[in-house]
């Protein structure tokens, strides 16, 4: 009786598979042929009760999976609830080949370094970037949050030489992610870390100083290879006044002043210090460095100026620093990552399931 029941289930599954396959093949070929000119394309829209950047996510088009991909499955894929695709914008339900996904985002983030560092240094920097990207994606996927800050460049838009070189690096690390206490981390990064003019030390900003949240693996660490962004960028505060002239014109109000003595390792000012006309500022608009990483002084004419360093939030891995460590010290990607993310471990997440899709389900049924 048991064998008859098993036989009946298998027969029913095979019959269902045949029906679905017959219906899927014409649809798959139609997908390849494209939509006839002038005919509107209808895309599925799911109800998602959230917004991204103020935009209603229910209005975002979803990336649709090819029928044959669903039937046969794919060995190495990653599905993101939201992802920016170059040339398309923000999309929902994005399912990509894992290697292509990591290559496309790595190229967007760090694609140009192959032209100014050695091939071996570029490989290690790309590996570090790919592992950080994979970890970031898995973290945001796990918690259902958006990875819309990243931009995926479709691999067919990447120059062949760059694609080949980056893909070599990605394939070597595609199964690796960063973990802390066994859980995948939010592996944030920025273009460049800051510079502490008091100590002469370049360094990153901690999660606590940047966002008010103490994250054990996002601590402030030294990042010595930031020269590319060490050119002073300034915003003039009170263009038409010297300090004395400005303060004399504001009788009874607080002077223009700034205390930059309380800094973390990277030179990021740790709390409200800048005062202008009685107001304190935590974040000042129009700065390319979104954290405090500045000195306050005057130019040759006595005009108040603010000088700041770095590019980006300065938390986690510095791309400039990672390239420098690889090029100047010969560091491998593991050393680079473990330097920037305090106390982390590397973990293999496997290469995906070669038994995916509907037929993967069938194979499990017959085991």
Language-model features: locations:
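Conserved, single-site charged/polar hotspot
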Residues: 2-367
């Amino acid at each position: 009786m048991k064998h008859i029941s098993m036989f009946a289930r298998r027969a029913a599954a095979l019959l269902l598979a045949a029906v679905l396959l017959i219906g899927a093949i014409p649809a798959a070929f139609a997908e390849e042929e494209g939509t006839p000119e002038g005919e509107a394309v209808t895309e599925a829209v799911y109800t998602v009760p959230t917004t991204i950047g103020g935009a209603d996510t229910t209005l975002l088009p979803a990336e649709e999976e090819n029928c044959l991909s669903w039937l046969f499955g794919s060995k190495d894929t990653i599905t993101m609830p939201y992802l920016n695709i170059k040339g398309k914008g923000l999309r929902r339900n994005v399912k990509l080949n894992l290697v292509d996904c990591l290559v496309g985002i790595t190229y967007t983030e760090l694609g140009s370094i192959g032209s100014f560092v050695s091939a071996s240094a570029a490989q290690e920097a790309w590996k570090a970037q790919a592992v950080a990207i994979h970890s970031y994606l898995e973290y945001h996927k796990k918690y259902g949050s958006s990875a819309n800050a990243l931009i995926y460049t479709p691999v067919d838009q990447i120059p062949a030489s760059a694609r080949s070189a980056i893909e070599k690096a990605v394939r070597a690390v595609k199964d690796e992610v960063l973990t802390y206490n066994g859980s995948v981390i939010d592996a944030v990064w920025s273009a460049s870390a800051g510079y502490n003019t008091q100590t002469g030390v370049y360094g990153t900003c901690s999660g606590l100083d940047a966002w008010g949240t103490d994250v054990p693996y996002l601590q402030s660490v030294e990042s010595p290879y930031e020269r590319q962004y060490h050119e002073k960028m300034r915003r003039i505060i009170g263009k038409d006044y010297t300090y004395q002239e400005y303060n004399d014109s504001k009788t009874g109000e607080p002077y223009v002043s700034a205390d930059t003595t309380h800094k973390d390792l990277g030179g990021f000012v740790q709390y409200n210090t800048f005062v202008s006309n009685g107001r304190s500022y935590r974040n000042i608009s129009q700065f390319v460095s979104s954290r405090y990483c500045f000195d306050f002084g005057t130019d040759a004419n006595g005009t108040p100026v603010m000088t700041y360093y770095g590019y980006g939030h300065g938390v986690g891995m510095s791309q400039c620093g990672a390239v420098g460590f690889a090029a100047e010290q010969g560091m491998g990607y593991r050393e680079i990552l473990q330097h920037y993310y305090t106390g982390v471990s590397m973990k293999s997440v496997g290469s995906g399931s070669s038994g995916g899709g509907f037929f993967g389900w069938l194979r499990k049924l017959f085991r």
